[in-house]
Amino acid sequence: MDLLRKYVSGYNLLLALGAFYMGTSILLSEGIFGEFPPEWTGRMPFNSWESLALFGIVVFGVGNAAIAVMGFVKNTKHVFGLTAMMGALLFAASVMPAVLVGEWYLPTVQLLAIGILQLALGLFGGLREQLKRTQQLTKQL
């Protein structure tokens, strides 16, 4: 198995575990997730911490876990494209609250950095795979 594919799959697994952990923490109302800010109601697509947590668990937890399993087990070339798509989705989900509410929060900035890294890993891996295929075709000619 390609070393880059292992690293990208490991990063996706780490993000999946983080999404499951944060989603569970939010659902259990642990930490800072007590009352949903009233100024967010009507401006954000979610109106409670629970709906936000379930969205994060399903989309980012299950999505990244599925991509990680694909990368570790199936050894497929689609891992990089799916990783880039999940990175773009995390990037968009991180920027959206700043646009809708008009303020940046520390977790949003951290998620933005994580999303940019995931997007970059996916794009780099995909470009590398494309370059390998181009070189193989050139050798055959």
Question: Where do the protein language model's features map onto the residues?
Answer:
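Topology signature of small-to-medium multi-pass alpha-helical membrane proteins
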Residues: 2-141
